[in-house]
Amino acid sequence: MLNTQRAQEIAASPIMANVTYQEVPIYIQHVDEQNETARIYPLDNPELEQDVPLSQLMEH
C-alpha cells in the first residue's frame, strides 16, 4: 500500500518505480491528496487511464 507522500514522490520522479494495481504494472500520472486517489494507467495500455484508491497500489 502506498501512502500519499510516497505516491507523489513516485509520480514526480523521472525514474520508473515498480508499482502495480491489481498485479498490473502501472504509471502514476497524478495524486489527489484530498481523495487519496491516483490517476494511473497500465504500462502496456497508456490509453486506459483511471482513478484508483492509493490503498490499492503496491510498490515492489
UniProtKB/Swiss-Prot annotation:
Keyword Aminoacyl-tRNA synthetase: no
Entry's Gene Ontology cellular component terms: endospore-forming forespore
Main location group: other
Localization, UniProt: Spore core
Induction record: Expressed only in the forespore compartment of sporulating cells.
Pfam families assigned: SspH
Gene Ontology BP annotations: asexual sporulation; sporulation resulting in formation of a cellular spore
Keywords, ordered alphabetically: Sporulation
HAMAP family referenced in this protein's UniProt entry, alphabetically: SspH
Similarity comment text for this entry: Belongs to the SspH family.
The name this protein goes by in its record: Small, acid-soluble spore protein H
Organism: Halalkalibacterium halodurans (strain ATCC BAA-125 / DSM 18197 / FERM 7344 / JCM 9153 / C-125)
Taxonomic lineage of the native organism: Bacteria, Bacillati, Bacillota, Bacilli, Bacillales
Gene: sspH
